[in-house]
């Protein structure tokens, strides 16, 4: 499941650069679904750092701050999962 999430992060980054808002919304929904499945499979990852990353991810997405969203995905979530 980690590979699915990491692939989805790459897909979202590509969409951010293409500025396709519909595709971004769809890809973000898939990412969230994949993260829920990952948490179910790997209970240990539910810790303070992961929760903080999710808050940052939600904040960036809600504000539609694509630069911040890309930063959280590339420099916080991706390294955490690798």
State what each model feature region is.
Residues 1-82:
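C-terminal-biased regions
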């Amino acid at each position: 499941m980690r590979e699915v999430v990491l692939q989805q992060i790459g897909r979202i980054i590509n969409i951010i650069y293409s500025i396709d808002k519909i595709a971004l919304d769809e890809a973000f929904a898939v990412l969230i679904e994949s993260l829920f499945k990952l948490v179910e499979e790997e209970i240990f990852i539910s810790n303070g750092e992961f929760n903080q990353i999710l808050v940052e991810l939600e904040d960036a997405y809600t504000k539609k701050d694509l630069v911040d969203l890309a930063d959280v995905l590339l420099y916080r979530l991706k390294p955490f999962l690798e």
